[in-house]
Regions:
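Pepsin/retropepsin-fold aspartyl endopeptidases
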Residues: 1-229
């Protein structure tokens, strides 16, 4: 089964509509959060939590400034092959492999705590970053931003800690020898410390998906890329 949806990139968030419900896709969350305890999608009914970390859909929507109905996490996402094309504003879910003429494929690294990561190169160092479709701002450990000029300050939120502000650093990252621009923020210490203990140096979100058409194959744990022209 395969189905494509138009996406609404509200402030960099990956959102689509399914049967009248606004759905935010977030590979950074292990569970799905909804207004009810189930979500019908692609011919299946999936379990939802009504709260995660003490936050429900109403609280998440308020932090975003956008009303969503479902916060789709990895318990649903990992069931599919998913292609995102931000230039065409389209996301495709498939239960079968999706034909994809990629420039390269890299492993998706799955952690014991449910984290989903990939390796990128920043400032000549190969580092592990969380792959987060829900992140409108990418983040990196402050050791990489030392000496970099702050280009602006932006507001962001995390369902676990609420709203916060971060300085933004305009930098570059590379994958498969392809260089792309990234506006990195600085993670709050409460988020940075546990990630670093797992060898994770931040999170890559909107910037990667805006630079490439991306195929996430969670059956084989591979991520494939095509350059957006």
């Amino acid at each position: 089964m395969v189905k494509s949806f138009l996406i609404d990139l509200f402030d960099g968030h990956l959102i689509f509509e399914n049967d009248g419900l606004k759905v935010l896709v977030d590979t950074g969350c292990p569970v799905t959060i909804g207004k009810s305890t189930h979500f019908d999608f692609m011919g299946q009914s999936y379990q939802c939590m009504t709260e995660f970390g003490g936050k429900g859909i109403a609280e998440i929507s308020a932090m975003m400034g956008y009303d969503i109905d479902v916060f789709m996490g990895m318990n649903i996402i990992e069931q599919f092959h998913i292609e995102t094309d931000y230039q065409s504003k389209e996301i495709t879910f498939s239960t079968e492999e999706i034909p994809f003429d990629s420039i390269c494929s890299i492993p998706i690294i799955r952690g014991r705590m449910g984290e989903v990561c990939i390796d990128l190169t920043v400032k000549g160092q190969n580092i592990k970053l969380a792959l987060d479709t829900g992140a409108r701002i990418s983040y990196i450990d402050e050791s990489f931003t030392n000496g970099e000029p702050v280009v602006e300050t932006r507001d962001d939120f995390n369902p676990m800690i609420g709203n916060f502000s971060t300085p933004i650093y305009s930098m570059e990252a590379s994958v498969c020898e392809q260089i792309f621009p990234v506006n990195f923020g600085k993670l709050p210490p409460v988020m940075a410390m546990p990630l670093k203990m797992m060898g994770i140096y931040g999170a890559i979100g909107f910037d990667l998906f805006n630079a490439f058409t991306v195929l996430m194959d969670f059956k084989k744990n591979m991520l494939s890329l095509k350059c957006n022209t």
